[in-house]
Amino acid sequence: MATTSAAVLNGLSSSFLTGGNKSQALLAAPLAARVGGAATPKRFTVLAAAAKKSWIPAVRGGGNLVDPEWLDGSLPGDYGFDPLGLGKDPAFLKWYREAELIHGRWAMAAVLGIFVGQAWSGIPWFEAGADPGAIAPFSFGTLLGTQLILMGWVESKRWVDFFDPDSQSVEWATPWSKTAENFANFTGEQGYPGGKFFDPLALAGTLNNGVYVPDTEKLERLKVAEIKHARLAMLAMLIFYFEAGQGKTPLGALGL
């Protein structure tokens, strides 16, 4: 009996079955108390925790290089890639995730604009601003100043909202909007406001009688898809910059 119980305990020590030290201790303690004595048959279920995905497939271990302890897989698209340890501080991790999300969204818009713009006009994206007719009847200084003012206003609101969530969804902060409700955070998560204004097609929610209701399942799925496409777009833009340095366009590099 003792031999059999020891074998069972040894099997329960496998993280493959129990998924963690805490689960192993909870399951092994009752059995250890009964080693060498009569045991009363009881039913119990062993739950295997889902393995955390790694940015290096089929590789386990490696310490914080492969599986950083400060990345627990709770963030969308988190595969444990942080070789420089930038996310050790929770405050910095939150800021870097916000930065990744915003830069990724701009990169996705830029990649689409580069392909569509060149296909439509035939002008390489890195030469588009050199065409005086492209910005007529406005001067370059006028466009630059307008963009700085408008972008500065929007970015300042995003900056303030990051440190003081929902502070910008009030009437005084949105004077040109009929209701501040359009800018409220419907999902309760930073960077994913949702609502009719930011999700007019209700891709991450539903519209019931004109009222936006977020759908957690759809939102989680779309967050992972978005961050994956955002990372690909940022990588694509890096490649586009190298190609532009050689006087090539993305379509030209593909022989199109």
Swiss-Prot record:
GO biological process, one term: response to light stimulus
Family matches, as SUPFAM superfamilies: Chlorophyll a-b binding protein
GO cellular component, one term: photosystem II
Name of the protein in its database record: Chlorophyll a-b binding protein CP24 10A, chloroplastic
One of the record's GO molecular function terms: chlorophyll binding
Keywords: Chlorophyll, Chloroplast, Chromophore, Membrane, Photosynthesis, Photosystem II, Plastid, Thylakoid, Transit peptide, Transmembrane, Transmembrane helix
Pfam families associated with the record: Chloroa_b-bind (PF00504)
Positions in coiled-coil regions: none
Protein's membrane topology: Multi-pass membrane protein
Provenance organism: Solanum lycopersicum
Main localization (coarse): plastid
Ranges that cross the membrane: 106-126, 134-154
UniProt subcellular location: Plastid, Chloroplast thylakoid membrane
UniProt family annotation: Belongs to the ELIP/psbS family.
